[in-house]
Amino acid sequence: MKKISDYSLLFKINSPEDLRKLAIEQVEQVCKELREYIIEVLSENPGHLGSNLGTVELTVALHYVFNTPYDRIVWDVGHQAYGHKILTERRESFHTLRKLGGISGFPNPQESEYDAFIAGHASNSISAALGMAIASWLKGENRKIVAIIGDGSITGGLAFEGLNNVSSNPNDLLIVLNDNNMAIDRSVGGLSQSLIKITTSYTYNTIRFKLYNFLKKYSIIKERERGFILRFTNSLKALLTKQHNIFEGLNIRYFGPIDGHNIKELVKVFEDIKSMKGPKLLHVCTVKGKGFGPAENKADVWHAPGKFNPETGERIKVWSENLPSLYQDVFGHTLVELARMNNNIVGVTPAMSSGCSMTFLMKEMPHRTFDVGIAEGHAITFAAGLAKEGMIPFCNVYSSFMQRAYDNIIHDAVLQNLNMILCLDRAGLVGEDGVTHHGVLDLAYLRCIPNITITAPLNEKDLRNLMFTAIQPNAKGVFVIRYPKGYGELKNWEYSFEALPVGKGRKLKEGKEIAVVSIGTIGNLARKAIRLVEKLGISVAHYDMIYLKPIDEELLHEIGKNYRCVVVIEDGTIKGGLGTAVIEFMVQNGYDPKIKQIGVPDEFIPHGTIAELYKLCGMDIKSIVKCLIEEK
């Protein structure tokens, strides 16, 4: 553990205003201390390490040059903004990162005025920043707006929509492309470096601006010809450097690439271009995990490594060999098995192949596995195209990210009754990633769609069997399987496949007084709670629906006829999910049991451990037991 004296400059910075008082030589030391502080805190309190080590100098330079919070910094995704949080009045609370009641792991305007726009999902920064920049222009403000987007996020469709619109409106937006994967070709040679110095210089841009105004004043060019002039100058630059890029084709002035870890160069370039008129993009090259050897060498492993020894780089294992398998690994291994059985099966995922374990199929059958990048809507429509031609796509998307592809599901898949499987990983409350990542809306927003099958397994065996069921001839149309992140319930799950009848649930336990109706893995908590209340003499039946749609009406008739009290338990929002379906059925069929709903309340849930959030929402075992006792 480092002492306060080890952070002689960083711990004196309580806001960017303090940072801006320092000499540039001192700012280099701030970068060193900031990187060390991030490593120290994250070694004990896990979070996103690699991306934050890579943006230290960029973050410091932005706050050193721009007048935040008056000037706006809009982060894309936002998991790389820890340094930003530390410099913006949250250093002392940084140890509470991602903890219940602590600061978020992503920018959140409700947390700080320095967080200009919410982040968590990818590719929204350019559109948001453009709107803010135009608002600033309309109000006659001199506010600078900066969007920070990575080379992964910029592949998203929303980013391209924003880029396409940037030059259509008057604005001085600055886009910083944080390239940490060398996804875009590098400029080479001395001419390119000289051109960067020239095109960012005050003299060049003053002459450029005055020349344009002169031509316009004397009607030599008209406003509508401005784009032609800009394209001409961009073409000239491309001719000189033997390079051209999409940004200049969209009439966005392009600068770079520059070293994203050279703080002096970053500060100089930001100072030179911040007052330039018109939209511009600065291409900054960074190294993910910069300054921490293990993270630089294995960027994928150290993206979010958990606890580790900051001195040795050894990751600290917190799991036991005796734990069940991860649901993600069950999905991955089962998909490989099914693909061996059926040559038409393919895998599709939007940039989450490792997280969802589709890498298993990718390793064995790379020609039948498609990682389409950060493009959820494209992933669904691409899978629909595969299905249209007779393939059987398993499209795996995190539940919260599937929200971005809602229209694609309806228009491109369901309306055509295409046979495809949507696997919603990270369903339910996900824990420390918080409000932008909880997958609690899926049951509700999918249930209202006609001609769709929606399922949720109780355990790993069910997940395996539902994947098998989804490829059977009687499983027509879009087949949804939702399951949570993390460990399952069973140590042995690799049984022979068994198709689960579509639209049929099951009665897990007999009971006389109360009927518990559940769907998904939260049913395991319900089983434990029921065993506890049985010891108190309360007789509780338990029904696992398996299918939300089509729902098992035979089971619901049985429940309506035989129980005066029904407790519905689900790990999704209580508005529109299983509970709503049960209430609708009972009303429509003339049953009048008392119905109690346990699930995610009608509000956005913060970050914290899953256990803490279940307790917060009244979904933990203790809360379920209390409810059953009260309803006796």
UniProtKB/Swiss-Prot annotation:
Q: Where does Mg(2+) bind?
A: D151, N180
Catalytic reactions of this protein: D-glyceraldehyde 3-phosphate + pyruvate + H(+) = 1-deoxy-D-xylulose 5-phosphate + CO2
Q: Name one GO biological process term.
A: terpenoid biosynthetic process
* Listed InterPro entries: Dxylulose-5-P_synthase, THDP-binding, Transketo_C/PFOR_II, Transketolase-like_Pyr-bd, Transketolase_C
Q: Give the CC-aspect GO terms.
A: cytosol
Q: What pathway annotation does it carry?
A: Metabolic intermediate biosynthesis; 1-deoxy-D-xylulose 5-phosphate biosynthesis; 1-deoxy-D-xylulose 5-phosphate from D-glyceraldehyde 3-phosphate and pyruvate: step 1/1
Cofactor(s) essential for the protein: Mg(2+); thiamine diphosphate
- State how the cofactor is bound: Binds 1 Mg(2+) ion per subunit. Binds 1 thiamine pyrophosphate per subunit.
State which Enzyme Commission number(s) the record gives.
Answer: 2.2.1.7
* Pfam families according to UniProt: DXP_synthase_N (PF13292), Transket_pyr (PF02779), Transketolase_C (PF02780)
**What UniProt keywords apply to this chain's record, in alphabetical order?**
Isoprene biosynthesis, Magnesium, Metal-binding, Thiamine biosynthesis, Thiamine pyrophosphate, Transferase
Q: Name one GO molecular function term.
A: magnesium ion binding
- The yes or no answer to whether the keyword Transferase is present is yes
Instruction: Look up the domain of life of the source.
Output: Bacteria
Residues reported in the UniProt entry to bind thiamine diphosphate = H79, G120, H121, A122, G152, S153, N180, F292, E376
How is the quaternary structure described?
Answer: Homodimer.
Role of this protein: Catalyzes the acyloin condensation reaction between C atoms 2 and 3 of pyruvate and glyceraldehyde 3-phosphate to yield 1-deoxy-D-xylulose-5-phosphate (DXP).
Q: Which HAMAP family match?
A: DXP_synth (MF_00315)
Family from the record: Belongs to the transketolase family. DXPS subfamily.
Protein known as = 1-deoxy-D-xylulose-5-phosphate synthase
Give the originating organism.
Azobacteroides pseudotrichonymphae genomovar. CFP2
Give me the gene this protein comes from: dxs
